[in-house]
């Protein structure tokens, strides 16, 4: 697979074209951002940890019948993925109250949400990824009702699979965000799944093991990521 020019550079990943029109190379960098890119730092080993973590999770989801963008690992920091037409909507599933939900509704952090909630956000850094609803998605043509229904179904299926996986590792899956795209007309899970895009707490102590350690200045960010990977059995 020939790596060609950079197609897109995000806050923590870069995307490159290849000699296959249906495949891209995803590079995980050491950049770590918070507050819609207003704060960015370099954290040693982060790119490699997230690349391998993402590969592990995506393979688990594929095995559970959820189609993903992931194809194969290419190096410590690169993987080969399907080229998707991305839908500009983030799907967020919450099992416990945290983050923006706490700020928006004034509820106590850590309250269990039964059943889990499903939320939508427009993927737009300039606007701060605003909270939207299903009517907005349909009215502005970001996805069809059928596509949105499939995204919601897959989101809850991801929650079911990963809740069990993390619980067995002594972790609580507090919440997570997913992005989807179209591959030859079919809805496919895209982007990544790593501690950058979810909240994970130790089941016993409630210690935060995700990017909130960076956002809140708690320190030992990569050490926490590596501990999560170790508990799951991710080969680093």
Curated annotation (Swiss-Prot):
Q: Which Pfam families match?
A: SAICAR_synt
Sorted UniProt keywords: ATP-binding, Ligase, Nucleotide-binding, Purine biosynthesis
Q: Which GO terms describe its cellular component?
A: cytosol
Q: What protein name does the entry list?
A: Phosphoribosylaminoimidazole-succinocarboxamide synthase
Q: What is its EC number?
A: 6.3.2.6
Is ATP-binding one of the keywords?
Answer: yes
Please report which protein family the annotation says this sequence is part of: Belongs to the SAICAR synthetase family.
Give the organism, scientific name: Pseudomonas paraeruginosa (strain DSM 24068 / PA7) (Pseudomonas aeruginosa (strain PA7))
Q: Which HAMAP family match?
A: SAICAR_synth (MF_00137)
The gene is: purC
Cell membrane found in the keyword field: no
The organism's superkingdom is given as: Bacteria
As its record notes, the protein acts as a catalyst of: 5-amino-1-(5-phospho-D-ribosyl)imidazole-4-carboxylate + L-aspartate + ATP = (2S)-2-[5-amino-1-(5-phospho-beta-D-ribosyl)imidazole-4-carboxamido]succinate + ADP + phosphate + 2 H(+)
């Amino acid at each position: 697979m020939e790596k060609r020019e950079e197609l897109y550079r995000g806050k923590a990943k870069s995307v490159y074209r290849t000699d296959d029109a249906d495949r891209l190379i995803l590079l995980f960098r050491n950049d770590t951002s918070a507050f819609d890119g207003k704060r960015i730092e370099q954290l040693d080993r982060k790119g490699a940890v997230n690349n391998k973590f993402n590969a592990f999770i995506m393979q688990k989801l594929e095995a559970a019948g959820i189609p993903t963008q992931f194809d194969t690992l290419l190096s410590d920091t690169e993987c080969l993925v399907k080229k998707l037409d991305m839908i500009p909507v983030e799907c967020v599933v919450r099992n416990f109250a945290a983050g923006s939900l706490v700020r928006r509704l004034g509820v106590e952090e850590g309250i269990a949400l039964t059943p889990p909630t499903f939320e939508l956000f427009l993927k737009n850094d300039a606007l701060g990824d605003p909270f939207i609803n299903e009517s907005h998605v349909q009215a502005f043509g970001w996805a069809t009702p059928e596509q949105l229904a499939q995204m919601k179904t897959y989101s809850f299926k991801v929650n079911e699979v990963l809740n069990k996986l993390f619980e067995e590792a002594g972790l609580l899956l507090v919440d997570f965000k997913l992005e989807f795209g179209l591959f030859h007309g079919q809805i496919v899970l895209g982007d990544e799944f790593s501690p950058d895009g979810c909240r994970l707490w130790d089941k016993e102590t409630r210690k935060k093991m995700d990017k909130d350690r960076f956002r809140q200045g708690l320190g030992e960010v990569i050490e926490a990521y590596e501990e999560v990977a170790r508990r799951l059995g991710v080969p680093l």
